[in-house]
């Protein structure tokens, strides 16, 4: 950097010296301003701060002038020192060493006295303020800190100065400055300590002081440490360097152990301040390397930036020296005692300096570093995330370790649990199946009982074969055919079998072929038959023990919808023992039957309706309930187009009454009143007028003929009488009249009839015997 008068220094050295100069000057001004205006509000303080920045340009000019004067004086001192060295080299080696030592000692003590005088003047100046102690200690601390900074950078600066002085740069700026004043303040504390140390030696102290006074009058030139290093290219002597390190170690030890927390707070505050004014500066070396290529003469940056970087660099240097001097504390314990009072003073000055820095920052109105706060929040969030990840990793490691230690036991435990679940499911399924099987068994038991009873019924049903000329099944069929039917063994006495069947099955033949379920056949004899009930009894003899008589049930307790089985031999022997299933479809049915095949119904048969399959050959077969008991005998079936499963059976209670008479008598005696009748529904209009029928009479019978001396004649019936009621029951036709009369075949008592004669209603009693 060219600062005029052919003085050239490196950019980095120029900037560093400029920062140090501005830092020391601004620190003194700010401390004084704080003491004078501590009771003024923030507005006034901000105005004062702005005035300081306005004066920074003047400071910049003063620095250049001071530095220029200093460099001129240094060149003169260098030339004089070279001349003295050439003279001293001509003498003896011992004399040269003595003179050189005395010269250095005298120059150093002269600087010490000058610094003492300057300190005295400063102390008088600061006593005028209300808090002189605070300002003095803060200034001493700053000066000692600057001295340590300069001593740490002296090697780098010396080489750079020597190199740049020989080769000036074309782009450097011209600056004139007197650096002597700034160096005097920075070296005063070190020289004062040396004088105090020498004064304790007694006589040696007085002699040295006199020499210093005499040399001072002669104006012996004093070289600073940096100048001496530039000329001689040698560091400080070993005793001086050791004393300097001891003093710095004692100060750092007191600061570190007593006010560690305050320094950490100050460091965080200055780091926040640094983020407002300058980019991040890691150390002085990197900063100098950047400054070698960038020239920045902004006064504001030079005022604010050095104070922050200076404090950071001082702390780094103090920490380094503190670590190095810990190993020397035992050897230097005696000397350390002498510096305890000075350490206490340094501690107090450090505390006051920190307070002053904080007040200065408040006066400057610096805003908090929001970027640093954001970075701190981001760091906290990152640390929480890392802790969460670490926790998860710890859990994973614990689980993995647990698995590696106990995996065989865990596998066995899991297998046991799975086995228990499977067995439980199996047992539940088995129990469910058992319950279902129980229900099925109950149904199966019933069904098995039914089948057992059906099998027994099959053993009681036989085939009855007879040749007949006509088929009496409904509908009427005039074609002659071989009649094949079924019969039921209702009674067995020894080897004698009593079989009930239909009258139209046996026909007119006395002997019938009886075939059993085991295909054995015998010839049976007809004991009796009744065409009005369509029942017949056949007697047969057989020693076959497989033939069983059937159990008799009760037809009076039949229930609509009751399950039934029909056992018979449809279509003959080839399909004997056929069992069909159905229900009772109807009760108390009156079925018209044509026995003589003259296309005129002869009788109303009282029966119950079933829907089981009945085919030709089932006539005379058994109708049994679920218990296998006989409840009826198949009698008829309606054979008409579009009609299915409409069959009828004679109730077993009626069958029992008839078969008893057929066994003993061979026939059934019915009462005969001796009349012939016509149905009113079949009369034409002339016949209706002849009998003088009223319009309201729709149903009934008209007496067409009366036998002489018959029961009807004896009862008073006449031809032309219209009977509408008999025995309290309405008459629909002549079949119903015969049915009511035959129903009294057992008691033969007289019954009341309601008649119309000559259009007049009348009642008469009809005799049945």
From Swiss-Prot:
The active site is at 504 (charge relay system), 534 (charge relay system), 619 (charge relay system). Its EC number is 3.4.21.-. It is found in: Cell membrane. It is a single-pass membrane protein. This is Serine protease HtrA-like. Residues 1-388 are annotated as: Disordered. GO terms for molecular function: serine-type endopeptidase activity. It comes from the Bacteria. It comes from Staphylococcus aureus (strain MRSA252). One of its GO terms (biological process) is proteolysis. Gene3D superfamilies: 2.30.42.10, Trypsin-like serine proteases. Residues 1-20 have a biased composition (Basic residues). The keyword Transmembrane applies.
């Amino acid at each position: 950097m060219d600062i005029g008068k052919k003085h050239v220094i490196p950019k980095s050295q120029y900037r560093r010296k400029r920062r140090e100069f501005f830092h020391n000057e601004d620190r003194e001004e700010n401390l004084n301003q704080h003491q004078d205006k501590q009771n003024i509000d923030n507005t006034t303080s901000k105005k004062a701060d702005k005035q300081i920045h306005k004066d920074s340009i003047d400071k910049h000019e003063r620095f250049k002038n001071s530095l220029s004067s200093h460099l001129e004086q240094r060149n003169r001192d260098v030339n004089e020192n070279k001349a003295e060295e050439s003279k001293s080299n001509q003498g003896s080696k011992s004399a040269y060493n003595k003179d050189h030592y005395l010269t250095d000692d005298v120059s150093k003590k002269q600087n010490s006295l000058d610094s003492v005088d300057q300190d005295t003047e400063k102390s008088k100046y600061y006593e005028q303020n209300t808090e002189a102690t605070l300002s003095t200690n803060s200034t001493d601390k700053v000066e000692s800190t600057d001295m340590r900074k300069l001593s740490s950078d002296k090697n780098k600066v010396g080489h750079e100065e020597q190199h740049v002085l020989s080769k000036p740069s074309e782009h450097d700026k011209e600056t004139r400055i007197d650096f002597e004043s700034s160096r005097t303040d920075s070296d005063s504390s070190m020289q004062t300590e040396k004088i105090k140390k020498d004064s304790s030696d007694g006589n040696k102290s007085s002699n040295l002081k006199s020499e210093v006074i005499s040399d001072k009058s002669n104006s012996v030139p004093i070289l600073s440490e940096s100048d001496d290093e530039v000329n001689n290219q040698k560091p400080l002597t070993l005793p001086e360097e050791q004393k300097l390190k001891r003093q710095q170690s004692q100060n750092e030890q007191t600061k570190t152990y007593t006010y560690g927390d305050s320094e950490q707070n100050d460091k965080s505050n200055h780091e926040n301040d640094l983020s407002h004014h300058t980019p991040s500066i890691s150390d002085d070396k990197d900063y100098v390397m950047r400054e070698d290529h960038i020239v920045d003469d902004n006064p504001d940056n030079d005022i604010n930036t050095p104070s922050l970087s200076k404090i950071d660099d001082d702390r780094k240097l103090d920490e380094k020296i503190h670590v190095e001097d810990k190993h020397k504390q035992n050897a230097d314990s005696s000397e350390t005692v002498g510096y305890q009072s000075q350490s206490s003073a340094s501690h107090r000055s450090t505390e006051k300096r920190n307070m002053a820095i904080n007040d200065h920052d408040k006066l400057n109105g610096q805003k908090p570093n929001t970027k640093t706060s954001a970075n701190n929040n981001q760091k906290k969030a990152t640390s929480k995330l890392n802790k969460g990840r670490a926790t998860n990793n710890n859990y994973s490691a614990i689980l993995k370790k647990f698995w590696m230690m106990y995996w065989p036991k865990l596998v066995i435990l899991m297998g046991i649990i799975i086995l228990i679940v499977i067995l439980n499911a199996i047992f539940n399924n088995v129990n469910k199946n058992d319950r279902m099987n129980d229900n099925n068994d109950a149904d199966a038991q019933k069904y098995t009982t039914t089948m057992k009873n059906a099998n027994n019924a099959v053993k009681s049903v036989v085939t009855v074969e007879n040749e007949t000329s006509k088929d009496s099944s409904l509908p009427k069929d005039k074609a002659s055919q071989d009649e094949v039917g079924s019969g039921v063994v209702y009674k067995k006495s020894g080897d004698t079998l009593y079989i009930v069947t239909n009258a139209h099955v046996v026909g007119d033949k006395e002997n019938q072929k009886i075939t059993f379920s085991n295909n054995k056949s015998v010839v049976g004899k007809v004991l009796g038959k009744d065409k009005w009930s369509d029942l017949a009894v056949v007697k047969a003899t057989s020693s076959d023990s497989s033939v069983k008589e059937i159990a008799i049930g009760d037809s009076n307790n039949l229930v609509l919808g009751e399950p039934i089985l029909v056992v018979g031999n449809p279509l003959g022997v080839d399909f004997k023992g056929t069992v069909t299933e159905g229900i009772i479809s109807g009760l108390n049915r009156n079925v018209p039957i044509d026995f003589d095949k003259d296309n005129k119904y002869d009788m109303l048969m009282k029966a119950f309706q079933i829907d089981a399959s009945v085919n030709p050959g089932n006539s005379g077969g058994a109708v049994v309930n679920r218990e296998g008991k006989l409840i009826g005998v198949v009698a008829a079936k309606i054979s008409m187009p579009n009609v299915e499963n409409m069959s009828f059976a004679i109730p077993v209670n009626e069958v029992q009454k008839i078969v008893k008479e057929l066994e003993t008598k061979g026939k059934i005696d019915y009462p005969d009143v001796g009349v012939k009748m016509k149905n009113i529904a079949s009369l034409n209009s002339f016949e209706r007028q002849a009998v003088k029928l009223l319009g309201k009479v729709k149903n009934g019978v008209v007496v067409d003929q009366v036998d002489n001396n018959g029961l009807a004649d004896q009862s008073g019936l006449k031809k032309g009488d219209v009977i509408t009621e008999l025995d309290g029951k309405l008459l629909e036709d002549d079949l119903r009249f015969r049915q009511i009369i035959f129903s009294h075949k057992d008691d033969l008592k007289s019954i009341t009839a309601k008649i119309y004669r000559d259009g007049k209603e009348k009642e008469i009693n009809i005799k049945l015997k």
